[in-house]
């Protein structure tokens, strides 16, 4: 099986005069393992169905209790339900977490769909005009619809042209008619009628130029520690991937040495010596004094093409990165060890502008502002371009043509 869960299932159907809807949920229990926290969860005011985790749920729970709200569980799901009961869509701004959610307000007869600030949790939809389907995977929607869809060849061409780094170029999915729910947004249905998508958060950088280098480093360190501390809130065993990379090494160090948590560590052991990082990994493990809780994982034997096919079919999209295959092997090992919650070092490139396609997307976004573009392009041409190995990502004009027209036009 490809997933760590599920360990519980639930459904809720509501029939109204002019429409009806059904929430379906399969649960991987992490917080409050009791069946009282299964989903969809319902109280007198609303119904919630969500995939994800609300990391600041204890702080939000205290806020609700101060307003007289009573709780029956110790789960983040119930806290999310109460927050949306109290604040509606404005409550999304209060959440620190990652989620794909569907919420129904009984009094207002309103449904809200939403996705987290960075699209960590997947959410796809298919809108026929009369029916609206949504799920964490495209394959689930196809099963609900009882039909299959044709490939979106323009999307496939983008993937072939730019690789996994081009998978976020547009909101369209790899199958025709399917779309990815927009990031940091929500959608309302009032009495069954769909309204426009709205943003609840925008990533507008606030630059503090007064900070020196040490202050900047200390600030990042403090933010990392606080973030990881919140994410340790779980009632299940915790694992952590560790490689020679700086991101996973930092996370492992904070968890083990600063927060003093005993967790299981997992590393990938490649068959090829060209990709062997074991010397640096072992130094990390020695420094953490974690040899007794560290495990090397290899890719499973058998038919690798079948494994790859299963992963792609389950997700409904190609791999974002070759490391997804390795991550699958580690997750399988974790499941065998009954280790459910997991820290992984990823997105460091995104945070510190290491993804070259992000530079190109920025240049495209300011292309019409001649003065701003010329300055940014000169900087990219001088400092960034020489570091790029892919010929496609070194050719800005070709990239621009693909974005503005059709990726097949340059073939």
Task: Report the location of each language-model feature.
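Cysteine-centered catalytic environments shared across enzyme families
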Residues: 1-315, 327
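Glycine-rich active-site loop/lid subdomains used to bind and stabilize high-energy intermediates
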Residues: 15, 25, 128, 286-293, ...
């Amino acid at each position: 099986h490809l997933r760590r869960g599920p360990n519980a299932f639930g459904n809720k159907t509501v029939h109204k005069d002019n429409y009806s809807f059904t929430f379906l949920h399969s649960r991987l229990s992490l917080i409050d393992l009791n069946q009282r926290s299964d989903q969809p969860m319902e109280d007198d005011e609303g119904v919630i169905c969500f995939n994800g985790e609300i990391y600041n749920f204890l702080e939000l729970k205290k806020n609700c209790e101060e307003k007289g709200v009573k709780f029956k569980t110790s789960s983040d799901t119930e806290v999310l339900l109460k927050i949306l009961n109290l604040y509606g869509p404005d409550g999304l701004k209060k959440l620190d977490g990652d989620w794909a959610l569907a919420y129904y307000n009984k009094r207002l007869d309103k449904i809200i769909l939403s996705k987290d600030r960075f699209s960590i949790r997947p959410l796809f939809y298919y809108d026929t005009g009369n029916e609206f389907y949504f799920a964490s995977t495209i394959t689930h929607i196809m099963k609900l619809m009882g039909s299959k869809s044709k490939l979106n060849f323009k999307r496939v061409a983008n993937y072939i042209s730019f690789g996994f780094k081009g998978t976020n170029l547009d909101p369209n999915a790899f199958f025709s008619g399917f779309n990815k729910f927009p990031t940091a947004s929500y959608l309302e249905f009032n009495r069954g009628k769909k309204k426009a998508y709205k943003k609840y958060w925008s990533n507008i950088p606030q630059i503090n130029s007064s900070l020196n280098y040490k202050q900047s480093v200390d600030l990042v360190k403090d933010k990392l520690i606080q973030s990881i501390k919140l994410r340790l809130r779980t009632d299940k065993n915790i694992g952590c991937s560790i490689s020679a990379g700086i991101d996973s090494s930092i996370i492992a160090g904070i968890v083990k040495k600063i927060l003093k948590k005993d967790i299981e560590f997992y590393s990938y052991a490649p068959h090829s010596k060209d990709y062997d990082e074991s010397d640096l990994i072992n130094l990390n493990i020695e420094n953490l004094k974690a040899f007794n809780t560290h495990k090397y994982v290899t890719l499973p034997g058998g038919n690798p093409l079948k494994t790859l096919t299963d992963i792609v079919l389950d997700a409904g999209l190609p791999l974002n990165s070759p490391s997804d295959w390795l991550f699958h092997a580690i997750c399988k090992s974790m499941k065998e060890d009954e280790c459910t919650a997991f820290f992984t070092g990823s997105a460091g490139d995104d945070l510190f502008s290491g993804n070259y396609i992000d530079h190109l997307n920025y240049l495209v976004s300011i292309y019409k502002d001649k003065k701003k573009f010329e300055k940014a392009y000169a900087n990219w041409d001088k400092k960034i371009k020489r570091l790029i190995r892919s010929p496609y990502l070194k050719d800005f004009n070709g990239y621009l043509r693909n974005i503005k027209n059709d990726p097949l036009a340059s073939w």
